[in-house]
């Protein structure tokens, strides 16, 4: 499945499950080295509820973001922006 097919499928699923605006929860696993956690957090506005927790060995940080999203397109755009950060796993 190509990236575009994946995002089209995700859009369909999001529209089936959510009505907008909605509080959407993003979850990411981010390598703790460097400023990658900061880069992920910086992609969301100050109104977002962001929590993070480092793994027991400190190699990774889980980042959870709860934020009001206005459309499935806006959610997909955030996923695409985060995907540009090397090593981030999107759950």
Predicted regions and their residues:
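Long, contiguous binding/interaction regions
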Residues: 1-62, 68-91
């Amino acid at each position: 499945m190509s990236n575009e097919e994946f995002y089209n499928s995700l859009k369909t699923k999001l529209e089936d499950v959510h009505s907008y605006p909605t509080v959407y929860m993003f979850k990411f696993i981010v390598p703790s080295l460097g400023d990658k956690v900061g880069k992920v957090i910086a992609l969301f506005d100050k109104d977002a509820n962001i929590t993070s927790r480092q793994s027991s060995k400190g190699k990774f940080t889980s980042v959870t973001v709860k934020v009001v999203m206005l459309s499935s397109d806006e959610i997909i755009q955030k996923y695409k922006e985060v995907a540009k950060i090397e090593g981030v796993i999107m759950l």
